[in-house]
Amino acid sequence: MNALDIINLSKSFGAQTALDSINLSVPTGSRTVIVGPSGSGKTTLLRMIAGFEFPDAGSLMLNGQTLVDRTHAVPAYQRQIGYVPQDGALFPHMTVADNIGFGLAETGSARAERIQALMDNVALNADMATRWPHELSGGQQQRVSLARALAQRPRLMLLDEPFSALDTGLRGAMRKMVARLLEEAGVTTILVTHDQGEALSFADQLAVMRDGRLVQSGHPMDLYRYPNDEQTAHFLGDAVVMPARIEAGWAHCDLGRVMVNSNGFAGAAQIMLRPEQLQLSDIPADPDGCHAVVTDRDFGGNVCTLTVELRTQASPGRSLLVRSSGMHAPPAGSAVQLSILGAAHVFATP
């Protein structure tokens, strides 16, 4: 069952098309991430769902109830949708407790107990209840904002790049905490971000937007491994893309003979490999295969990103990105042999 159905949703601002016939279903209890570059339309779509903007065409349905269509629109405050903005947007003149309790129907001891339970859920100490927003760290402010949104028992939670202002180390921990909390609460969630790593990590369902259009959606692992086009491939992570001729399930390319994931296609095509699919080894005494030289090593601790230059007759001098364990990454100048882990992805022909 779907919690949210987005049907042919379109929106323009003057001559600029912000959303172009968006169709997307969000399963109940899932975490859907809408990812795309700046100007792709992802924030406009989130604002449509929240009720802050209204579409020119199309409709939205939440748990079978129409939120907006050509004839009417449910006001934002009646949609039972929680919203956590990028900066938390706490009320500066209210304490933590009053921010969380804003709008609660409960009064007296019931209200205090509800606020304390919400603080416990987001790992805020009881002594923070009387603090002011300016006395909190960025991570603490986001926890308060999340607790305030959960206080209304929303049917859907919207997260608008809530981790982008946090330090790198805190960002990952906060993301995991939020994912766990929302899953335990059974709240369907939509996160908007431009951070590819965050999107892949958080999502059950990933939706990629570009120029106001939804270009691909599905499980994040499927989109990473089998993107629809080269632009999507590069947006979701580093990619090695090259021309090839496909015959009987194999690609003949600059790397030699490479297995592909499309047995039904033959002819000229573009293939894609992720850098982690390229494996390096020492050249054997009787060399045979695809050889290269390491020209650059970017040490990243547990993982190194290497640039290697091919030494093949077909494409001498071509540079490729390779990922290797930081423990065994060869230094610049090393002669290596390349092998392929798994199959290359063949882009669909236009």
Curated annotation (Swiss-Prot):
Gene: fbpC
Protein family (similarity comment): Belongs to the ABC transporter superfamily. Fe(3+) ion importer (TC 3.A.1.10) family.
Signal sequence residues: none
GO CC, any one term: ATP-binding cassette (ABC) transporter complex
Enzyme Commission (EC) number: 7.2.2.7
Catalysis: reaction(s): Fe(3+)(out) + ATP + H2O = Fe(3+)(in) + ADP + phosphate + H(+)
Organism: Pseudomonas fluorescens (strain Pf0-1)
Domain ABC transporter, first and last residues per copy: 4-236
Pfam families on file: ABC_tran, TOBE_2
Chain sites annotated for binding ATP: G36, P37, S38, G39, S40, G41, K42, T43
Protein name: Fe(3+) ions import ATP-binding protein FbpC
Matching InterPro entries: AAA+_ATPase, ABC_SmlMolc_Importer, ABC_transporter-like_ATP-bd, ABC_transporter-like_CS, ABC_transpr_FbpC, Mo/tungstate-bd_C_term_dom, P-loop_NTPase, Transp-assoc_OB_typ2
Keywords, in A-Z order: ATP-binding, Cell inner membrane, Cell membrane, Ion transport, Iron, Iron transport, Membrane, Nucleotide-binding, Translocase, Transport
